[in-house]
Amino acid sequence: MRTSQLFYKTSKNANKDAAVLSYELLEKAGYIFKTAKGVYTYTPLFWRVALKMMDIVREELNAIGGQELMLPILHPAELWQKTGRWEAFRSEGLLYTLTDREDKELCLAPTHEEVVTMFVSQWLSGRKQLPIHLYQIATKFRDEIRPRFGLMRAREFLMEDSYTFSDSPEQMNEQYDKLRRAYQKIFDRLEIKYVIVEADGGKIGKGKSEEFHVLCSLGEDTICVSGDYGANIEAAVALPVQYTYDKEFLPIEEVATPDVRTIENLQDFFSIPPYRIMKTLVVKLSYGEKNTFVAIGIRGDRQINLTKIRSKLNADECALASDEEIQNNLGTEKGFVGPLNCPIEFYADETTRCMTNFICAGNAKDKHYKNVNWDRDIPRPEYADFLLAEAGDLCPSNGNAPYEIFEGVEVAHIFNLGTRYTECFDVGFQNEQGEQQTCWMGTYGIGIGRTLAACVEQLADDRGIVWPKAIAPFDISILYNGGDSASQEAAEKIYTELQNSGYAPLLDDRNERLGFKLKDSDLIGIPYKLILGKTFLNSGTLEIESRSGEKFSVQPKDFVHWCENYLPQSQKLSSAS
């Protein structure tokens, strides 16, 4: 490709509305164009990168027996109503809905579990067809509330999604492991830093679930890592620091605590450390259209994890109660809710199990109790893990080694769904005994646009984008001073040789000075620059510089050999070349 033929445009100035680095650089370098809020045109330059990414995805999924198809984007409401997700998604305001001329409701697909399950239910003829692995790479839609992060949180986005159907839980797990390894190979080929973490299934399902996170400073998600084990902070099981408590119970005391409502206030008032305080928070749980309130007790130096609470109590949604909701439902104020005679159902985190002689609020304004104890003063509640993990907590899945906390961006998610969807659509087969048996399902997805944006977030430097070699739009740029006929002639010859050898060079044939071309090449992130400058004119030596700054001096006769060593062979097979 010649730059004079490439339809692209770079900009000197950053978009002031770009909230993250990837949005700024992808727009500045001519990869995306904002069509509307959260909606982007993928330019020819971007599409070259996306095609290479999709080539890698297809190669790895086809290698494990995946079959590509294309599912519809327009979904009838009754399919989503069948699984109960129509109202769940609409309640969050994320679903694009419309009504056709027959007054039937439809939506633009945010995901495809319902559609693919209905399709398989009609075509599956018997057990011998299982397992089935179907996948697509397609556009999806979500009406995001604040689509400010470019491709990280767009309203229209490109995804690969896979669906597996199996004859048993064992076969479902085998398919899960195959997809997990395939996804690992995909991200390994990108040569980026990522971790696989245990995750919460959310609205998709409640089976085994893991996320792939690219590590970067954007910090959309917080992940806990200990050795080779990782978990999203929403799902991380952690063992906090343990403290020694009194063995002898002291007499309980009611204490007036005027306007003493925070942990810090209580520490100062009673002159005690926070781990001797029982903190109680009121949580609103939503079950469809019904709301209920529960109280959660936790050690005063720690925070609750709302995702764990939602999962444990099987709620659709979970949030901290507002001041008004606390007043209306408990008759007291925030900061004065406690476990003693609590008027709503009370649960406690495991951190509180061994606490003795603790301080807690008295369910009335300006009142606390001192030296409170389980069994004597309060019946023991139901304990569960409601703890939000922190750096330094011990990881039980890694021999109680400590956690480190990192920031990352979720780029892929894999789930075991069990029979949640297949039961709704009667997807099954007859077993050896002639009994009808339901299929077991898995769902998996890679955000193509999110992955590319995450690569930019992780690898970019002060000069611009740094693409992984495997997905860069071009293998190498050929640069010379515009108007220099000798350099131009050599550049044309090298360009032709590279094309004939199957590589994807970008010949910058614009009548611009070399310095301008160098900056453009760095901005758009091409892995190598072949520079035909003074050194070439004086000695005939080719100067090559990698995007990371590594420099090579190569004689023309050795250039083909250099290409074979440094330009990845896989690029020669890419549909973008």
Swiss-Prot record:
EC category name: ligase
Protein localization: Cytoplasm
UniProt keyword list: Aminoacyl-tRNA synthetase, ATP-binding, Cytoplasm, Ligase, Nucleotide-binding, Protein biosynthesis
GO biological process: one example: prolyl-tRNA aminoacylation
Annotated catalysed reactions: tRNA(Pro) + L-proline + ATP = L-prolyl-tRNA(Pro) + AMP + diphosphate
EC number(s) per entry: 6.1.1.15
Listed SUPFAM superfamilies: Class II aaRS ABD-related, Class II aaRS and biotin synthetases, YbaK/ProRS associated domain
Annotated Pfam families: HGTP_anticodon, tRNA-synt_2b, tRNA_edit
Keyword ATP-binding: yes
Cellular-component GO terms for this entry: cytosol
Keyword check for Chaperone: no
GO terms assigned for molecular function: aminoacyl-tRNA deacylase activity; ATP binding; proline-tRNA ligase activity
Domain remark from Swiss-Prot or TrEMBL: Consists of three domains: the N-terminal catalytic domain, the editing domain and the C-terminal anticodon-binding domain.
Protein family (similarity comment): Belongs to the class-II aminoacyl-tRNA synthetase family. ProS type 1 subfamily.
Function as written in the Swiss-Prot or TrEMBL entry: Catalyzes the attachment of proline to tRNA(Pro) in a two-step reaction: proline is first activated by ATP to form Pro-AMP and then transferred to the acceptor end of tRNA(Pro). As ProRS can inadvertently accommodate and process non-cognate amino acids such as alanine and cysteine, to avoid such errors it has two additional distinct editing activities against alanine. One activity is designated as 'pretransfer' editing and involves the tRNA(Pro)-independent hydrolysis of activated Ala-AMP.
Subunit structure: Homodimer.
Name used for this protein in its record: Proline--tRNA ligase
Organism of origin: Chlamydia felis (strain Fe/C-56) (Chlamydophila felis)
Name of the coding gene: proS
